[in-house]
């Protein structure tokens, strides 16, 4: 009895001592500034000789000065803010939501991303189990770009079947109920990713190897590029294209007839504004310091914003009308499951899960942690579960599904700071960016051509990530056949999006059957969804084969181990770390294939 009392007293003393030391450390230089050489964060002075130096590495739980953690957290937030704010604006435009609602969705997305990132980094152990929620690493969550490839198709179908309203001229009216139905469907379908998080990662890698992930990511990026280019040319909606005289009554200038400096779609002025963003990104990549390159997309956007503001393209009424502070649920949407969207949403969560595996592997690599074994598997499990729960909660917070972003891996690699404290600061900064609604309103007020110049580059980087994954698999007959089959319908549906619209001609009273047929139509007309289903199916049924002509020096099996640079992996799949041992494991079991894929990883 006396021993237990002594133990309790010792524990209390330890807690008190730790608290005392923490309070005392607040008043020290080491706590706030430390002895870090902050010149590492500054650009190099041109035409001067400088001694080569490398910043120290800060591990996951190392003591990092508050100032350094704040600066690096801000760097992480800048690297992902463009990717977080673009999807809500694009999806809101597809639902023709009001400017006030669009402002709110951008704010809600930033707030949700900040809160869910905190949970992902903190990592919570589920009591009495071996499972976790979160990775426990510097993993940031943002709005999935895959949603951008699904939502416009779903909302377009809602307008066609009467779920969303049109006026007597056929002009699409605001459809908040359609957006709410998309949220409800996303919320329910997120249970699939939550379920998959409890499947061992090795099995998931067998089900979804690079031959599946590569073409799917390529198709996602390709399908998104058209949306970015439409914005680059002036915007989407009633102003798109140049109408004939018969179509003129329903046509408007971009972004609208009453907007300042309104012009016709595709005008040279619009193309020039978007090109200013694109050119700035290229200039920074060529002449900018390494740390600046990780935020080249945002800096390009800033340059485009300055040019467009100076030439009178901004609608300041959007910013003036926005409240100073906002929060989730200021605007709500009626939640109702839209059956035809279930299949595409399930495909979306499969893709998000595949991306999470690659991102977690990349973050572990640049954080100098294990990329194999039980500890790594636990991080993968926690990360996928964190993604699934974040998407479920985000849907209830009026935000579309979230996923682990990859661009922060480039910041970690350059700054050599994998410390979670920097991640916590990043999450808090994102939260306050969303909390102050004026900040979100700035992103809504950005002229479409300026935003299009940035998003087209972002979306193209998604496609490049898919190409990078594909380039690292053996190009034997089996893999070429799977790629060809998945690209046949996947790329075809992107190029001719309404090719399957008239396949079903049923118009009877059976609403369940109509919903089922609409679901099939959505899948067949969504390039990444049909491509994913085909590649998964063929990968499971086609036998593996050995090609003696393929070696590690073959063009189809690169052995270079690239590192995320914050540009190529803007969307969220690291092509190197997502390449698993799957092909090798299968081949060893069947004693047919001896290609050493581990060298790629």
From Swiss-Prot:
Record's subcellular location: Vacuole membrane
Sample GO molecular function, one term: xanthine transmembrane transporter activity
Transmembrane spans: 64-84, 102-122, 131-151, 179-199, 207-227, 264-284, 294-314, 337-357, 424-444, 450-470, 481-501, 522-542
One of the GO BP terms on file: xanthine transport
Membrane topology classification: Multi-pass membrane protein
Entry keywords, A to Z: Membrane, Transmembrane, Transmembrane helix, Transport, Vacuole
Record Pfam families: Xan_ur_permease (PF00860)
Highest taxon in the source lineage: Eukaryota
Gene Ontology CC: one annotated term: vacuolar membrane
Family: Belongs to the nucleobase:cation symporter-2 (NCS2) (TC 2.A.40) family.
Name of this protein: Putative purine permease C1399.01c
């Amino acid at each position: 009895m006396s021993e237990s009392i002594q133990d309790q007293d010792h524990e209390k003393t330890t807690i008190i001592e730790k608290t005392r030391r923490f309070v005392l450390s607040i008043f020290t230089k080491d706590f706030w500034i430390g002895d870090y050489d902050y010149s590492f964060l500054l650009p190099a002075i041109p035409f001067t000789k400088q001694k080569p130096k490398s910043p120290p590495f800060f591990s996951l739980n190392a003591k990092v000065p508050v100032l350094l953690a704040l600066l690096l957290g801000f760097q992480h937030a800048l690297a992902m803010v463009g990717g977080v704010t673009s999807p809500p604006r694009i999806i809101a435009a597809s639902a023709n939501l009001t400017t006030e609602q669009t402002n709110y969705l951008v704010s809600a997305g930033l707030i949700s991303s900040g809160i869910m990132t905190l949970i992902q980094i903190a990592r919570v152990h589920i009591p009495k189990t071996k499972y976790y929620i979160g990775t426990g690493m510097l993993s940031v969550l943002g709005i999935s770009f895959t949603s951008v490839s699904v939502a416009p198709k779903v909302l377009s179908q809602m307008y066609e079947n009467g779920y969303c309203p049109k006026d007597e001229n056929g002009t699409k009216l605001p459809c908040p109920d359609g957006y709410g139905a998309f949220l409800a469907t996303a919320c329910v379908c997120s249970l699939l990713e939550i379920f998959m998080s409890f499947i061992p990662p090795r099995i998931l890698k067998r089900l979804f190897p690079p031959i599946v992930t590569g073409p799917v990511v390529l198709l996602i990026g390709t399908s998104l590029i058209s949306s970015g280019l439409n914005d680059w040319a002036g915007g989407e909606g009633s102003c798109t294209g140049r109408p004939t005289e018969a179509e003129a009554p329903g046509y408007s200038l971009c972004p609208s007839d009453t907007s300042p400096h309104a012009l016709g779609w595709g005008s040279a002025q619009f193309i020039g504004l978007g090109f200013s963003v694109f050119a700035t990104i290229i200039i920074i990549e060529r002449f900018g310091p390494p740390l600046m390159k990780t935020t080249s997309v945002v800096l390009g956007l800033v340059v485009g914003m300055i040019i467009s503001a100076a030439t009178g393209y901004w609608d300041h009424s959007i910013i003036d009308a926005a409240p100073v502070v906002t929060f989730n649920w200021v605007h709500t949407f009626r939640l109702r499951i839209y059956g035809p969207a279930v299949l595409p949403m399930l495909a979306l969560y499969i893709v998000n899960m595949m991306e999470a595996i690659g991102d977690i592997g990349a973050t572990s690599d640049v954080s100098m942690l294990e990329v194999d074994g039980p500890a790594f598997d636990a991080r993968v499990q926690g990360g996928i579960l964190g993604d699934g729960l974040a998407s479920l909660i985000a849907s209830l917070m009026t935000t579309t599904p979230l996923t682990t972003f990859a661009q922060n891996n480039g910041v970690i690699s350059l700054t050599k700071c994998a410390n979670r404290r920097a991640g916590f600061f990043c999450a808090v900064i994102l939260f306050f960016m969303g909390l102050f609604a004026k900040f979100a309103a700035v992103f809504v007020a950005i002229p479409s051509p300026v935003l299009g110049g940035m998003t087209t580059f972002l979306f193209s980087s998604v496609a490049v990530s898919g190409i990078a994954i594909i380039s690292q698999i053996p190009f034997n007959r089996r893999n070429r056949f799977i790629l060809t089959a998945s690209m046949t319908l996947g790329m075809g549906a992107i190029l001719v999006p309404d090719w399957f619209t008239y396949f079903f001609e049923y118009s009877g009273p059976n609403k369940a059957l109509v919903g089922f047929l609409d679901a099939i139509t959505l899948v067949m007309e969504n390039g990444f969804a049909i491509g994913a289903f085909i590649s998964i199916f063929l990968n499971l049924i086609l036998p593996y084969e050995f090609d003696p002509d393929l070696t590690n020096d073959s063009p189809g099996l690169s052995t270079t181990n690239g590192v995320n640079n914050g540009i190529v992996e803007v969307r969220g799949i690291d092509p190197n770390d997502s390449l698993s041992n799957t092909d090798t494991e299968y081949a060893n079991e069947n004693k047919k294939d001896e290609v050493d894929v581990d060298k790629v990883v």
